[in-house]
C-alpha cells in the first residue's frame, strides 16, 4: 500500500 498527499491524498 502506497499513499501520497501531493497534490491530493490518494492511496494505492
Swiss-Prot record:
Tissue specificity as recorded in UniProt: Expressed by the skin glands.
| Cellular compartment(s) | Secreted
Keyword list, A-Z = Amidation, Amphibian defense peptide, Antibiotic, Antimicrobial, Disulfide bond, Fungicide, Secreted
- GO CC terms for this protein? extracellular region
GO terms classed as biological process: defense response to bacterium; defense response to fungus; killing of cells of another organism
Asked whether the UniProt record includes rRNA-binding among its keywords, one would answer: no
- Where in the sequence is Tyrosine amide found? 12
Q: Which domain of life is it from?
A: Eukaryota
Tell me the disulfide pairings in this chain: 3-11
Which function does this protein serve?
Antibacterial activity against B.subtilis, E.coli, S.aureus, M.luteus and P.putida. Antifungal activity against S.cerevisiae.
Q: What is this protein called?
A: Tigerinin-3
Q: Which organism is it from?
A: Hoplobatrachus tigerinus
Identify the taxonomic lineage of the organism of origin. Answer: Eukaryota, Metazoa, Chordata, Craniata, Vertebrata
Amino acid at each position: 500500500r502506497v499513499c501520497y498527499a501531493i497534490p491530493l491524498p490518494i492511496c494505492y
